[in-house]
Amino acid sequence: MVPKLFTSQICLLLLLGLLGVEGSLHAAPQKFTRAQWFSIQHIQTTPLRCTNAMRAINKYQHRCKNQNTFLHTTFAAVVNVCGNTNITCPRNASLNNCHHSRVQVPLTYCNLTGPPTITNCVYSSTQANMFYVVACDNRDQRDPPQYPVVPVHLDTTI
């Protein structure tokens, strides 16, 4: 009985450790609000090559992010989407703070192609015009006061 209990405890610790790591990968670096981090990760008014564009994100996370989507629009335009009807987030049904864009935007999808080394993360890119769904929250006191509700998570593209 003792070996089974010990094995179960080890498995539980490993699972909790993995969940902790996964949660921390989605958190904003401490110096940024969630909206600021959203903007860094997902807003790019002028398309750049993925390998170059991803450097800023990877620098703060100290790893090569596997994939990322850049919306080629403005932060203000995405804030306006936060005013659309609340929906359940397609990728996380426990959240109901998502909002569907009414118009398609040009975007770039970046996908890590090679074995990741933090000094040389190489990405392929795919361009498309798509709708998107963002999660929005009340602004942090460090966010611009003209935006009472701000995007904090790109949930999916459609």
From Swiss-Prot:
<comment type="subunit">
    <text>Interacts with and forms a tight 1:1 complex with RNH1. Dimerization of two such complexes may occur.</text>
</comment>
<feature type="modified residue" description="3'-nitrotyrosine">
    <location>
        <position position="60"/>
    </location>
</feature>
<feature type="glycosylation site" description="N-linked (GlcNAc...) asparagine">
    <location>
        <position position="111"/>
    </location>
</feature>
<dbReference type="GO" id="GO:0016829">
    <property type="term" value="F:lyase activity"/>
</dbReference>
<feature type="disulfide bond">
    <location>
        <begin position="64"/>
        <end position="121"/>
    </location>
</feature>
<dbReference type="GO" id="GO:0003676">
    <property type="term" value="F:nucleic acid binding"/>
</dbReference>
<dbReference type="GO" id="GO:0005615">
    <property type="term" value="C:extracellular space"/>
</dbReference>
<feature type="glycosylation site" description="N-linked (GlcNAc...) asparagine">
    <location>
        <position position="92"/>
    </location>
</feature>
<feature type="disulfide bond">
    <location>
        <begin position="82"/>
        <end position="136"/>
    </location>
</feature>
<feature type="active site" description="Proton acceptor">
    <location>
        <position position="42"/>
    </location>
</feature>
<feature type="signal peptide">
    <location>
        <begin position="1"/>
        <end position="27"/>
    </location>
</feature>
<dbReference type="GO" id="GO:0051607">
    <property type="term" value="P:defense response to virus"/>
</dbReference>
<feature type="active site" description="Proton donor">
    <location>
        <position position="153"/>
    </location>
</feature>
<feature type="disulfide bond">
    <location>
        <begin position="50"/>
        <end position="110"/>
    </location>
</feature>
<keyword id="KW-1015">Disulfide bond</keyword>
<dbReference type="GO" id="GO:0006935">
    <property type="term" value="P:chemotaxis"/>
</dbReference>
<dbReference type="GO" id="GO:0002227">
    <property type="term" value="P:innate immune response in mucosa"/>
</dbReference>
<keyword id="KW-0540">Nuclease</keyword>
<keyword id="KW-0456">Lyase</keyword>
<dbReference type="GO" id="GO:0004522">
    <property type="term" value="F:ribonuclease A activity"/>
</dbReference>
<dbReference type="InterPro" id="IPR001427">
    <property type="entry name" value="RNaseA"/>
</dbReference>
<feature type="glycosylation site" description="N-linked (GlcNAc...) asparagine">
    <location>
        <position position="86"/>
    </location>
</feature>
<comment type="function">
    <text>This is a non-secretory ribonuclease. It is a pyrimidine specific nuclease with a slight preference for U. Cytotoxin and helminthotoxin. Possesses a wide variety of biological activities.</text>
</comment>
<feature type="binding site">
    <location>
        <begin position="65"/>
        <end position="69"/>
    </location>
    <ligand>
        <name>substrate</name>
    </ligand>
</feature>
<keyword id="KW-0458">Lysosome</keyword>
<keyword id="KW-0325">Glycoprotein</keyword>
<dbReference type="GO" id="GO:0005764">
    <property type="term" value="C:lysosome"/>
</dbReference>
<keyword id="KW-0732">Signal</keyword>
<dbReference type="Pfam" id="PF00074">
    <property type="entry name" value="RnaseA"/>
</dbReference>
<keyword id="KW-0944">Nitration</keyword>
<keyword id="KW-0378">Hydrolase</keyword>
<feature type="disulfide bond">
    <location>
        <begin position="89"/>
        <end position="98"/>
    </location>
</feature>
<dbReference type="InterPro" id="IPR023412">
    <property type="entry name" value="RNaseA_domain"/>
</dbReference>
<protein>
    <recommendedName>
        <fullName>Non-secretory ribonuclease</fullName>
        <ecNumber>4.6.1.18</ecNumber>
    </recommendedName>
</protein>
<keyword id="KW-0255">Endonuclease</keyword>
<dbReference type="InterPro" id="IPR023411">
    <property type="entry name" value="RNaseA_AS"/>
</dbReference>
<comment type="similarity">
    <text>Belongs to the pancreatic ribonuclease family.</text>
</comment>
<dbReference type="InterPro" id="IPR036816">
    <property type="entry name" value="RNaseA-like_dom_sf"/>
</dbReference>
